[in-house]
Amino acid sequence: MVPNYSTEETVKRIHVDCPVSGRHSYIYIMVPTVYSIIFIIGIFGNSLVVIVIYCYMKLKTVASIFLLNLALADLCFLITLPLWAAYTAMEYQWPFGNCLCKLASAGISFNLYASVFLLTCLSIDRYLAIVHPVKSRIRRTMFVARVTCIVIWLLAGVASLPVIIHRNIFFAENLNMTVCGFRYDNNNTTLRVGLGLSKNLLGFLIPFLIILTSYTLIWKTLKKAYQIQRNKTRNDDIFKMIVAIVFFFFFSWIPHQVFTFLDVLIQLHVITDCKITDIVDTAMPFTICIAYFNNCLNPFFYVFFGKNFKKYFLQLIKYIPPNVSTHPSLTTKMSSLSYRPPENIRLPTKKTAGSFDTE
């Protein structure tokens, strides 16, 4: 739906160029249902991850700090999801006021940037820990990790400011309903292009290239170590995991990014056909479901590969309190890529297998 704005009242009155685009009865049922499932699984899962990492693992590793913040970022988004489920179920009628319109929209944007930035930092941390285990010890400290997370939250907040400023409620005259959307001046294309392309570039393309490069270099390093030892009985799970992480990230986010770019073209009136607009508006909520279902699974995807996490997760389920005496043993095996190869395998850098630990 492409809005045209007509007055300067408290609640702006708009005219939608393609009023029926994206408005299908099955969307009003399917999307809220999926949102509800994501909300339940995400709140439950990410809350458990936060409790296990903070209370049982005690933030003893750099990776644990990134994973904790990743779970917190997802929780920030998830608490706004019931609003979007209700909004869709009510056929895009927004009854929650202008303030919640801004905050809920900012929550989506904030989670996008915070999660992607944290995943990028986690991939860089894995690269440093595995490829440069000795040189990176000085840089990979708990203090640096905490400062990095603070910077990421600030950057995500700054990136979300345009959403807070320009997202408002409007009354769509030809739809006879109040909607939550962006207001674009007809002659100002900078904001339209900027918001869309920043999501494409900063929220996907650049982080993905960094993640892909990091895990590719990790894969080459581990492969070289195996080739030197000629160990035919090696375990290739680490290679499969690296490939899975990259492809899972890419294929979960690429649909939403493509349709975001098409939406920019619609806002710029490069695409004016209402049939194409209907396709974009119809597909957009489903691409959001795919993207954020991936985000909610990220903590599980990374953490459940850690041996210690499974133990503490079971303790939490059985209401067994954390054992303080076990804390010193938690400095390793935190993240999904903290990998310890067989003892007879050494990296070409002449470091022992212990250099694969997460510290």
From Swiss-Prot:
Residues modified by glycosylation: N4, N176, N187, N188
One Pfam family linked to the record: 7tm_1
Ranges facing Extracellular side: 1-25, 90-98, 166-190, 269-278
Keyword Glycoprotein found: yes
UniProt note on tissues of expression: Adrenal medulla.
Main location: membrane
InterPro entries: ATII_AT1_rcpt, ATII_rcpt, CCR1-9-like, GPCR_Rhodpsn, GPCR_Rhodpsn_7TM
UniProt entry tagged with the keyword Membrane: yes
Function, as annotated: Receptor for angiotensin II, a vasoconstricting peptide, which acts as a key regulator of blood pressure and sodium retention by the kidney. The activated receptor in turn couples to G-alpha proteins G(q) (GNAQ, GNA11, GNA14 or GNA15) and thus activates phospholipase C and increases the cytosolic Ca(2+) concentrations, which in turn triggers cellular responses such as stimulation of protein kinase C.
Protein name: Type-1 angiotensin II receptor
Lineage, opening ranks: Eukaryota, Metazoa, Chordata, Craniata, Vertebrata
